[in-house]
Amino acid sequence: MEAIAKYDFKATADDELSFKRGDILKVLNEECDQNWYKAELNGKDGFIPKNYIEMKPHPWFFGKIPRAKAEEMLSKQRHDGAFLIRESESAPGDFSLSVKFGNDVQHFKVLRDGAGKYFLWVVKFNSLNELVDYHRSTSVSRNQQIFLRDIEQMPQQPTYVQALFDFDPQEDGELGFRRGDFIHVMDNSDPNWWKGACHGQTGMFPRNYVTPVNRNV
């Protein structure tokens, strides 16, 4: 996940990471502390204050969604190449790419080299975003021609919804919120569970806990 720095930050401890306003940071772990994230910049990693950055949620990043839930969601998509990136269940801190092809969903481990670059095969990238963009026109598979395509959205649905009730996550990959919170809907292709962003976090939430709002927030 990527974030953009809103302010300059000067590290005051050995395990903190300095950055300048406008820097793009790779957020490695959002769960270390309520107020601090672990992030990487220019090959160095350390802790950064949460309130100094703005997350850049991508519609294809689903966080800690379980592999089975990813397969269920992608199997409902109509076109080959529909994909999402999730945090690996078997290797915490790593990422997996799940892609629909035919009647199956294929999973690819996103690898990283010693310099922190991401890759699937040979070509390496500075960010997951660059990897995704490259594989929109270059197959992710060596056995079939599979080009990444965004999950189909339903544009008639609202961009924002408001929480009717408190929701506390029961599983990894779910999005917690309080009654009255506004949630940015990032994917509503599943009738029961939608993906959204709230308070800088992204995750899945139950559709029946929210109501549409007729304005942007």
From Swiss-Prot:
N6-acetyllysine: residues bearing it: 6, 50, 109
Keyword flag Repeat: yes
SUPFAM superfamilies tied to this protein: SH2 domain, SH3-domain
Chain residue numbers at which the record places covalent cross-link Glycyl lysine isopeptide (Lys-Gly) (interchain with G-Cter in ubiquitin): 109
Pfam families reported in the protein's UniProt record: SH2 (PF00017), SH3_1 (PF00018)
Disruption phenotype: In a conditional knockout mouse model, Grb2 deletion induces a rapid decline of myeloid progenitors (CMP), myeloid/erythroid progenitors (MEP) and granulocyte/macrophage progenitors (GMP) and a progressive decline of long-term-HSC and intermediate-term-HSC numbers.
Gene Ontology BP terms: actin cytoskeleton organization; anatomical structure formation involved in morphogenesis; B cell receptor signaling pathway; branching involved in labyrinthine layer morphogenesis; cellular response to ionizing radiation; endodermal cell differentiation; epidermal growth factor receptor signaling pathway; ERBB2-ERBB3 signaling pathway
A GO cellular-component term linked to this record: cytoplasm
Biological function: Non-enzymatic adapter protein that plays a pivotal role in precisely regulated signaling cascades from cell surface receptors to cellular responses, including signaling transduction and gene expression. Thus, participates in many biological processes including regulation of innate and adaptive immunity, autophagy, DNA repair or necroptosis. Controls signaling complexes at the T-cell antigen receptor to facilitate the activation, differentiation, and function of T-cells.
Domain statement: The SH3 domains mediate interaction with RALGPS1 and SHB.
Quaternary structure (record): Associates (via SH2 domain) with activated EGF and PDGF receptors (tyrosine phosphorylated). Interacts with PDGFRA (tyrosine phosphorylated); the interaction may be indirect. Interacts with IRS4 (when Tyr-phosphorylated). Also associates to other cellular Tyr-phosphorylated proteins such as SIT1, IRS1, IRS2, SHC and LNK; probably via the concerted action of both its SH2 and SH3 domains. It also seems to interact with RAS in the signaling pathway leading to DNA synthesis. Interacts with SOS1.
Protein name: Growth factor receptor-bound protein 2
Protein's organism: Mus musculus
Lineage: Eukaryota, Metazoa, Chordata, Craniata, Vertebrata
